[in-house]
Amino acid sequence: HFDLNARLSPDKNPFFKRGEAVLFTAWRDKQLVGRCSAQIDHEHLRVHKDGSGFFGFFDTFDDLEVARTLLASAAAWLRPRSVSRMMGPFSLYANEEVGILVEGFEYPPMMMMSHSRPYQGALCEAAGLVKEKDILAWRFSDPELPPRAVRAWEEVKKMPEVTLRSVDLKHMDRETDILQQIYNDAWSGKWAFVPALPDEVKKMAEDLKLIVDPDIAFIAEVNGEPAGMCIMLPNLNEAIADLDGKLLPFGFAKAIYRLKVKHPVSTRLMMLGIREAYRKQRRYGGLSAAMYVESARRGFAKGYKWAE
């Protein structure tokens, strides 16, 4: 969701069919000094049975009192709703932005990735939260690919039953169904995974259709059956960096031009996964490496310089 109002609207965001949320703002002397959400994803509770409620959209000045007050408000809202722990930030849940950035502030924000103020991690810990998990973002910019991965790619390309085909934007309903099936299979059992529901995938496809570059988004098929996917997107943040957040009236047209004609040099590798049935087969043991090589080759050939 690129429109924050729509993202937080129960009428427009399919999340609210599976969850509920409340939004908090903090004020001091009539000045806005912070914000935070609290939310419950009932699908997460059904899958993981871990009693976790979430907080998210956490942003404050460097002020421990404000941070404590916001996080305490989120916890107080969650407590009577039969959850035993608070985890976050999730904005709004695990299929969207997750975590607080604690390293890498020298790089500009990447689309659909958390980007926090440098002090926010320390504020959360000072307010009493403890680290749940490290999440790593990898930056790749070297066209000299590892020989072992290239060999895997070469072997996969020789397999007559394997096809790596671009996403077909003219048949997005079909492609959306395929992506949902692969995602729910390939990510099942992973940390904080929750199945993507049809309405959520449809909404995501609507949001992303205008920026998808089919040259760097592809599906792996084995004997005509979807086996894996790699969805890499042009970095929208790079395209709108000088628009000061104003897409209307002319900013949106500028962004689309920069994405489609004068495309960015950076990309976001949003999803890469392989269905379990193919991960278990020795013959396709190199498919994952091959898909990384394929994505890199496609990206560099199109003029992109780096990916996260």
Task: Describe the predicted segments one by one.
Residues 1-30, 36-47, 166-275, 293:
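A conserved beta-strand-loop-helix scaffold within acyl/acetyltransferase catalytic domains
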Residues 92-94, 143-145, 235-237:
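Short, solvent-exposed loop/turn segments at secondary-structure junctions
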